């Protein structure tokens, strides 16, 4: 059984895979694989578990190269065109948003997603914590969308939208 002091020590710092991902070296999953491959050392000792928490004072190396410190948190606006999938990879081989970004951009994450046939503002960030905070419905932030409809929908067709519809357990109003 964990005591409060032991629990505090375990929770200090961040998981090493998260720190590697935050530094822009690799995704969290790729960082976990790099760790399991024995390529990561913390304070000179090779580690084989991604469960290790590290503090900012710890020296992390990958293949004996010191991991750079994480860059400042940034947020970019991207005007997503129709026809791109909001994903890092698409199992169907379709073009993804990340294929369209400038090569000079650091590794970024999309905040939410837009459907393949949708266009408009997509936020990108280099910080997974910010991404999660912006995506969570519990933040209570109002999201507004502008929708274009092809043709002229009838009142009967629009009535459910005017009454509000449930999407992902949330009541949405127009």
Whereabouts are the PLM-identified features?
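Basic, flexible Lys/Arg- and Gly-enriched helix-loop patches that mediate nucleic-acid binding at interfaces
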Residues: 2-172
């Amino acid at each position: 059984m964990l005591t409060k002091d032991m629990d505090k020590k375990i929770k200090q710092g961040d998981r090493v895979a998260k720190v590697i991902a935050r530094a822009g070296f690799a995704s969290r999953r790729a960082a976990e694989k790099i760790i399991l491959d024995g390529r990561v050392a913390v304070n000179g000792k090779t580690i084989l578990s991604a469960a290790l928490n590290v503090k900012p004072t710890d020296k992390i190396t990958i293949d004996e190269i010191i991991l750079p410190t994480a860059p400042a948190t940034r947020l970019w606006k991207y005007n997503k065109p129709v026809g791109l999938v909001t994903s890092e990879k698409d199992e169907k081989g379709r073009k993804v948003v990340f294929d369209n970004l400038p090569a000079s951009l650091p590794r970024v994450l999309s905040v939410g997603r837009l459907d393949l046939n949708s266009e408009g503002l997509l936020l990108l960030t280099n910080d997974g914590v910010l991404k999660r905070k912006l995506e969570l419905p519990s933040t209570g932030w109002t999201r507004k969308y502008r929708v274009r409809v092809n043709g002229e929908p009838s009142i009967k067709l629009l009535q459910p939208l005017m009454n509000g519809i449930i999407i992902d357990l949330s009541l949405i109003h127009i």
